[in-house]
């Protein structure tokens, strides 16, 4: 069983190496100090601190947008245009800029295009009803705008499911894909049964009616920092209205129809998507390869350096083994 200190360090994203470092420097962390850190984390000021980490600018990123049929899609181009093209897709609530360091690492070998999906980041919500095919259409719209005939796709969480949709509806456009800590239907969601989560069995829930979820508070502040606070409020209302219809809903037959080679990366300590579900997904996709990153949490797998290094290595080796 984890100690109070270990639970708090996990909450604050201080890993085992960090704990040993503190001990080696004779830094004494007593219970009062830990409680102070916890109070800080739950306070308004610390939500701002973590929000600032989600809006770090992407080094040498070029922001662009394309408008089509009532929706404006924002995207960021990073890396040498002569390198192989790679489209990156973020998770729910997040946006491209939230993955700045991860994208910069991908751009070492690829021309990366990070797309803010509808209602996320700086992209507008649009008026068309949500569908899995619509998200795939949006990605193809951006690819066509940039003249990308064929490309690689890397998606985290909801972005990994979007990859499945692109592979299903536009298999001729995707060379290979990478799905990180993702799922293929709602059964893969690890619901938090307490009344403070933003994903429930009845759909997305925001922080109205005295509900309190600090992840949402952090994202609220992050969106305000990029000038999209009002839009994000609208996005949350739309997501609440969709109920469970916004959740992934592919069947086994859908996965078996996918021919695109896909690397499935599992976060070993995923607290959002059930690892066993993601493993099962890899078995159902014919041309898939499975990698498990032991100890990695859902978001930490693409945010913490020790896990990021492993994931980037897997991606580079899978997409272009001889490169």
Where are these regions (language model features)?
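Conserved alpha/beta-hydrolase catalytic His-Asp/Glu region
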Residues: 188-194, 202-257
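Conserved HGGG/HGGXW glycine-rich cap/lid loop of the alpha/beta-hydrolase fold
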Residues: 77-122
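Active-site loop/oxyanion-hole signature of alpha/beta-hydrolase fold enzymes
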Residues: 117-151
């Amino acid at each position: 069983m984890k100690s109070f200190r270990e639970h708090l360090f996990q909450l604050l994203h201080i890993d085992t190496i960090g704990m040993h470092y503190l001990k080696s420097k004779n830094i004494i962390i007593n219970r009062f100090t830990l409680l102070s850190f916890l109070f800080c984390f739950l306070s308004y000021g610390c939500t701002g601190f973590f929000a600032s980490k989600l809006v770090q600018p992407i080094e040498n990123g070029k922001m662009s947008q394309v408008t089509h049929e009532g929706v404006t899609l924002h995207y960021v181009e990073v890396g040498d245009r002569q390198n192989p093209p790679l489209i990156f897709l973020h998770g729910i609530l997040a946006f491209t800029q939230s993955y700045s360091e991860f994208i910069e690492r991908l751009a070492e070998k690829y021309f990366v295009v990070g797309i803010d999906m509808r209602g996320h980041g700086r992209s507008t919500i649009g008026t068309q009803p949500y569908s899995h095919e619509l998200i795939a259409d949006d990605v193809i719209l951006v690819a066509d705008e940039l003249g990308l005939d064929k490309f690689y796709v890397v998606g985290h969480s909801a972005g990994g499911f979007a990859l499945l949709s692109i592979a299903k509806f536009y298999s001729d456009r995707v060379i290979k894909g990478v799905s990180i800590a993702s799922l293929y239907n709602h059964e893969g969601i690890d619901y938090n049964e307490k009344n403070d989560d933003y994903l429930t069995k009845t759909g997305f829930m925001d922080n109205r009616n005295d509900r309190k979820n600090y992840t949402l508070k952090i994202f609220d502040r992050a969106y305000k920092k990029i000038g999209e606070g009002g839009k994000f409020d609208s996005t949350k209302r739309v997501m609440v209205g969709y109920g469970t219809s916004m959740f992934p809903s592919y069947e086994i037959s859908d996965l078996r129809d996918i021919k695109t080679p896909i690397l499935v990366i599992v976060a070993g300590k995923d607290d959002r998507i059930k690892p066993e579900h993601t493993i099962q997904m890899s078995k159902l996709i014919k041309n898939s390869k499975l990698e498990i990153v032991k100890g990695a949490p859902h978001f930490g797998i693409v945010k913490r350096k020790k896990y990021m290094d492993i994931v980037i290595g897997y991606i580079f080796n899978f997409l272009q083994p001889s490169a």
